[in-house]
């Protein structure tokens, strides 16, 4: 279950700020950035413009995908006995793709992006910060599970689906893991 607290360590605050910036500061064509441009053009204050962008980001077709990643990992943790067993993890990822488990949508959330097919630069930055946070907070095993899924998912997807451009983890993959940590 997601935990929201009243106070955060300096490292937690820094990583959370980084996650928000990486989600918001991303070119001019995505939904939340476009929303910011439209709302700002009305002459409103900065806080209102950022609030509008965050409201847009919350939508499931934009940044809300990170919530799906979070719940997918909660499901994986419940069903995978050995978090270090690549074969068991890959088999479960296949079941997700085949709509046999989790939300039965056939998607491994946090994988793939329309533009970033080799790697998502935002994800690379966020992953490093989340790794430091996981180590500091004693969530090394959780982080290792994320890394295993990140490594195995493209192989499983490539085996089950036709992938023309490649598939890599995106910024949503690690963004809500920090809330759990």
Stretches found by the model and what they are:
Residues 1, 5-179:
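Non-transmembrane, aqueous-exposed alpha-helical and coiled segments at domain scale
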């Amino acid at each position: 279950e997601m935990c929201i607290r009243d106070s955060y360590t300096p490292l937690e605050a820094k990583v959370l700020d980084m996650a928000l910036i990486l989600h918001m500061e991303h070119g001019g064509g995505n939904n939340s950035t476009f929303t910011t441009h439209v709302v700002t053009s009305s002459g409103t204050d900065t806080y209102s413009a950022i609030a509008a962008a965050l409201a847009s980001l919350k939508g499931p077709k934009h940044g809300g995908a990170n919530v799906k990643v979070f719940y997918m990992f909660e499901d994986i943790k419940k069903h995978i006995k050995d978090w270090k067993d690549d074969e068991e993890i890959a088999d479960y990822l296949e079941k997700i793709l085949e709509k046999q488990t989790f939300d039965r949508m056939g998607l491994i959330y946090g994988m793939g992006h329309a533009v970033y097919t080799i790697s998502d630069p935002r994800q690379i930055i966020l992953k490093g910060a989340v790794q430091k946070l996981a180590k500091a907070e004693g969530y090394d095993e959780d982080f290792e599970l994320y890394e295993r899924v990140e490594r195995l998912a493209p192989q499983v997807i490539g085996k089950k689906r036709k992938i023309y451009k490649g598939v890599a983890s995106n910024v949503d993959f690690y963004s809500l893991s920090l809330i759990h940590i």
